């Protein structure tokens, strides 16, 4: 919790210190230079704060309310040592003592020094020759000393030739460094150390919570406070949080770059240049407006779209001498010309223009129909052939395989589309003389495609389809079938060669296997396939029948196989292999009689080592053929699962058979006898074989087959 400061007590102490300094200054003025007054107190250098004195002028102390020992929280508290005084650099206003009420003593001017005391040092050190000088020299020196005194009074920081004045000023600054008169208001004083003290004091007060308005309320000049705030980079706004230091470097930079612009000049303007010199701009001249260009008649008489009379010109190409209508002259329609604007001088209404456009549209439609009629008479359409003539001969479904079916289906779809297409004749018979459009016919095989005019709204669309002769259709069908047959025959030949090569490879493999089995004395001829299975008789028969009647072969295959698959898909033969017991995966497989025959390393095999941890993976580096040298590898390694001969024998003898304790004891006793009969020089394999034989013998003697009670 922050400590509250009593401002009244601070004001009282500040007034006492001020009065004491005034007394010291008056004593110094009465003393001669170089003398020490008896009334001067001995200054204690250890304590910079002057001793407290009881005020002798009670009228200077304002009457304040009684002191409260437990005052409330002050919004503007000042945690500094008493008496606190801002440096004199801030005091440009009438109140020279900040944070204190203004009294009569604050405006009191100090008494001037005596002329004798000011010049006592100079008079004492004068030469004897100067004492006998005339009165004119004395009066002149008196005037010079008077001017020097006035200069020292107005500017205390200026250089003075009087050394006594310098000593007195130095003594006063040592006694009270915080107090000074308003004579320090000169601009040169801002370069002294007091300005740094002022900046330091303002920053400390700002950290405590004193803001711009608080300084103004105490009577400090606003411009001085504003300058200090800008120099320190503090925010001069009234509303700010406690203890926050808002830097306003941008404002300071902008204020430093401000330039004066003289706006009183009439024809000159100061522009922001490099040297800041004003630039005189030339006076503006009155521009003479140029006359507008005279528009042409055709520009002034232009009208919006649709307002002018439409003119349509249709030309006919009559260079065909073979036409029946080549010599006939087409009479142009005699349409009445609408009255133009230039003739009558009247503007036509919108309805008149629309009626005129409709008439022109009807005329264009009639002329287009006439053109179509002429074109149809020149190269008329033939009647479409019937769909019966377009039918293809029936192709047996079983004659081809699935791949051929897809090709045939695609071909039939194309033929159906061509046979079922609607051939549209040219529009209705249009003739001004009543002649029919289907009168003339030609033998031309191609027709010209007529483009549809966008203004034909009521005419039927004309579709032109290229026709083919039935003989051409049959010829194309035969060509397609021939291509399909050739393709399928090529694939069949490819499959036949592939089957032959695979058959030869299998024959060689089975022959090699038979030789190896005969070398081991365990030939198994029954596992080899028959020679009839490896012959190509069946394949050749199938190919011959496919050439003669492929439909019967495909029907027989598809009828016996499910889901449309052939029997060849289920005839893949798997070569026979020897029987392998599932018990070989157990560790007790070592007691099997075939263990030694089937396992190459026999009892030393790592596969059946009991040191293998089933819940621990093997090192990936060793499983790929490398050697793991990592001591911190947590995976299993092959070097860890190796077992010595003694460990293997102990592991084999650890298997105790028996369902109860009696059987287990009998098995142990028999195993001990077997181990005692072995010598130290006995081979490891022989010892392990004896243990396995004893285990199997004991199991065979006690193997019982439960037989149910059967009554005969």
Curated annotation (Swiss-Prot):
<dbReference type="InterPro" id="IPR039278">
    <property type="entry name" value="Red1"/>
</dbReference>
<dbReference type="GO" id="GO:0031047">
    <property type="term" value="P:regulatory ncRNA-mediated gene silencing"/>
</dbReference>
<feature type="compositionally biased region" description="Low complexity">
    <location>
        <begin position="130"/>
        <end position="141"/>
    </location>
</feature>
<feature type="region of interest" description="Disordered">
    <location>
        <begin position="1"/>
        <end position="71"/>
    </location>
</feature>
<dbReference type="GO" id="GO:0071920">
    <property type="term" value="C:cleavage body"/>
</dbReference>
<dbReference type="GO" id="GO:0033620">
    <property type="term" value="C:Mei2 nuclear dot complex"/>
</dbReference>
<feature type="region of interest" description="Disordered">
    <location>
        <begin position="545"/>
        <end position="568"/>
    </location>
</feature>
<feature type="region of interest" description="Disordered">
    <location>
        <begin position="428"/>
        <end position="447"/>
    </location>
</feature>
<dbReference type="GO" id="GO:0000785">
    <property type="term" value="C:chromatin"/>
</dbReference>
<dbReference type="GO" id="GO:1902794">
    <property type="term" value="P:siRNA-independent facultative heterochromatin formation"/>
</dbReference>
<dbReference type="GO" id="GO:0016604">
    <property type="term" value="C:nuclear body"/>
</dbReference>
<keyword id="KW-0479">Metal-binding</keyword>
<feature type="coiled-coil region">
    <location>
        <begin position="471"/>
        <end position="501"/>
    </location>
</feature>
<keyword id="KW-0175">Coiled coil</keyword>
<feature type="zinc finger region" description="C3H1-type">
    <location>
        <begin position="618"/>
        <end position="639"/>
    </location>
</feature>
<dbReference type="Pfam" id="PF10650">
    <property type="entry name" value="zf-C3H1"/>
</dbReference>
<dbReference type="GO" id="GO:0030674">
    <property type="term" value="F:protein-macromolecule adaptor activity"/>
</dbReference>
<dbReference type="GO" id="GO:0140602">
    <property type="term" value="C:nucleolar peripheral inclusion body"/>
</dbReference>
<dbReference type="GO" id="GO:0008270">
    <property type="term" value="F:zinc ion binding"/>
</dbReference>
<dbReference type="GO" id="GO:0005634">
    <property type="term" value="C:nucleus"/>
</dbReference>
<comment type="subunit">
    <text>Interacts with mmi1, pla1 and rrp6.</text>
</comment>
<feature type="compositionally biased region" description="Polar residues">
    <location>
        <begin position="178"/>
        <end position="193"/>
    </location>
</feature>
<feature type="compositionally biased region" description="Polar residues">
    <location>
        <begin position="327"/>
        <end position="348"/>
    </location>
</feature>
<dbReference type="InterPro" id="IPR019607">
    <property type="entry name" value="Putative_zinc-finger_domain"/>
</dbReference>
<comment type="function">
    <text>Promotes the exosome-mediated degradation of mRNAs containing a DSR (determinant of selective removal) signal sequence from mitotic cells.</text>
</comment>
<feature type="coiled-coil region">
    <location>
        <begin position="5"/>
        <end position="32"/>
    </location>
</feature>
<dbReference type="GO" id="GO:0043144">
    <property type="term" value="P:sno(s)RNA processing"/>
</dbReference>
<feature type="region of interest" description="Disordered">
    <location>
        <begin position="107"/>
        <end position="195"/>
    </location>
</feature>
<keyword id="KW-0862">Zinc</keyword>
<protein>
    <recommendedName>
        <fullName>NURS complex subunit red1</fullName>
    </recommendedName>
</protein>
<feature type="compositionally biased region" description="Acidic residues">
    <location>
        <begin position="23"/>
        <end position="42"/>
    </location>
</feature>
<feature type="coiled-coil region">
    <location>
        <begin position="351"/>
        <end position="379"/>
    </location>
</feature>
<feature type="region of interest" description="Disordered">
    <location>
        <begin position="323"/>
        <end position="348"/>
    </location>
</feature>
<dbReference type="GO" id="GO:1990251">
    <property type="term" value="C:nuclear exosome focus"/>
</dbReference>
<keyword id="KW-0863">Zinc-finger</keyword>
<dbReference type="GO" id="GO:0033621">
    <property type="term" value="P:nuclear mRNA surveillance of meiosis-specific transcripts"/>
</dbReference>
<dbReference type="GO" id="GO:1990477">
    <property type="term" value="C:MTREC complex"/>
</dbReference>
<dbReference type="GO" id="GO:1990342">
    <property type="term" value="C:heterochromatin island"/>
</dbReference>
<keyword id="KW-0539">Nucleus</keyword>
<feature type="compositionally biased region" description="Polar residues">
    <location>
        <begin position="545"/>
        <end position="567"/>
    </location>
</feature>
<feature type="compositionally biased region" description="Basic and acidic residues">
    <location>
        <begin position="1"/>
        <end position="22"/>
    </location>
</feature>
<dbReference type="GO" id="GO:0071030">
    <property type="term" value="P:nuclear mRNA surveillance of spliceosomal pre-mRNA splicing"/>
</dbReference>
């Amino acid at each position: 919790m922050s400590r509250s400061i009593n401002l009244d007590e601070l004001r009282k102490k500040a007034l006492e210190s001020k009065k004491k300094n005034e007394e010291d200054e008056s004593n110094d003025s009465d003393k001669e230079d170089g003398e020490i007054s008896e009334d001067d107190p001995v200054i204690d250098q250890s304590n910079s704060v002057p001793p407290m004195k009881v005020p002798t002028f009670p009228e200077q102390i304002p009457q304040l309310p009684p002191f409260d020992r437990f005052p409330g929280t002050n919004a503007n508290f000042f945690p500094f040592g008493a008496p606190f005084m801002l440096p004199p650099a801030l005091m440009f206003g009438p109140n020279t003592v900040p944070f204190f009420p203004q009294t009569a003593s604050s405006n009191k001017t100090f008494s001037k020094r005596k002329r004798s005391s000011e010049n006592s040092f100079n008079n004492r050190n004068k030469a004897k020759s100067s004492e006998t000088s005339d009165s004119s020299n004395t009066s002149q020196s008196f005037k010079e000393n008077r001017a020097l005194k006035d200069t020292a009074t107005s500017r205390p920081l200026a250089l003075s030739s009087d050394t006594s004045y310098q000593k007195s000023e130095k003594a006063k600054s040592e006694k009270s460094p915080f107090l000074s008169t308003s004579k320090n208001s000169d601009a040169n004083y801002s370069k002294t150390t007091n300005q740094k003290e002022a900046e330091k004091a303002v920053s400390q007060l700002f950290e405590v919570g004193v803001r711009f308005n608080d300084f103004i309320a105490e009577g400090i000049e606003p411009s001085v406070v504003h300058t200090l705030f800008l120099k320190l980079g503090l925010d001069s706004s009234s509303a700010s949080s406690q203890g926050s230091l808002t830097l306003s470097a941008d404002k300071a930079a902008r204020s430093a770059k401000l330039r004066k612009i003289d706006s009183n000049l009439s024809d000159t303007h100061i522009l922001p240049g490099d040297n800041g010199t004003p630039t005189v701009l030339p006076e503006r001249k009155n521009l003479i407006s140029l006359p507008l260009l005279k528009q042409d008649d055709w520009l002034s008489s232009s009208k919006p779209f649709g307002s002018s009379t439409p003119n349509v010109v249709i030309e006919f190409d009559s260079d065909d001498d073979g036409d029946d209508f080549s010599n006939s002259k087409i009479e142009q329609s005699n349409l009445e010309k609408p009255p133009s604007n230039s003739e009558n001088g009247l503007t036509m209404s919108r309805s008149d223009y629309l009626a005129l456009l409709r008439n022109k549209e009807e005329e264009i439609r009639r002329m287009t129909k006439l053109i179509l009629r002429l074109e149809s008479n020149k190269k008329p359409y033939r009647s479409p052939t019937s769909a019966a003539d377009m039918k293809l001969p029936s192709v047996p479904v079983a004659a081809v395989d699935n791949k051929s079916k897809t090709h045939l289906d695609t071909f039939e779809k194309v033929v159906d589309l061509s046979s079922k297409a609607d051939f549209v004749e040219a529009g209705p018979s249009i003739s001004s003389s009543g002649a029919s459009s289907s009168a003339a016919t030609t033998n031309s095989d191609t027709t010209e495609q007529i483009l549809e005019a966008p203004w034909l709204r009521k005419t039927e669309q004309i579709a032109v389809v290229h026709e083919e002769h039935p003989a051409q259709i049959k010829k194309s069908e035969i060509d397609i079938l021939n291509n399909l047959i050739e393709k399928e025959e090529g694939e069949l030949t490819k499959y036949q060669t592939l089957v032959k090569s695979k058959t030869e490879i299998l024959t060689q493999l089975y022959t090699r296997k038979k030789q190896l089995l005969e070398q081991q004395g365990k030939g198994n001829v029954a596992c080899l396939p028959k020679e009839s299975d490896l012959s190509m008789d069946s394949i050749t028969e199938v190919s011959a029948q496919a050439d003669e009647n492929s439909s019967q072969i495909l029907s027989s295959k598809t009828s016996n196989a499910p889901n449309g698959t052939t029997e060849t898909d289920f005839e893949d033969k798997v070569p026979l292999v020897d029987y392998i017991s599932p018990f070989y995966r157990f560790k007790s497989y070592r007691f099997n009689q075939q263990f030694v025959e089937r396992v190459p390393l026999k009892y030393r095999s790592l596969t059946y080592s009991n040191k293998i941890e089933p819940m621990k993976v093997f090192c990936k580096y060793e499983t790929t053929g490398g050697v793991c040298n990592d001591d911190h590898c947590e995976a299993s390694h092959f070097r860890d699962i190796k077992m010595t001969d003694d460990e293997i024998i102990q592991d084999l003898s650890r298997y105790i058979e028996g369902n109860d304790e009696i059987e287990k004891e009998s098995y142990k006793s028999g195993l001990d006898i077997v181990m005692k009969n072995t010598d130290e020089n006995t081979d490891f394999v022989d010892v392990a074989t004896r243990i396995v034989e004893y285990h199997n013998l004991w199991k065979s003697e006690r193997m019982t087959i439960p037989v149910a009670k059967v009554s005969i």
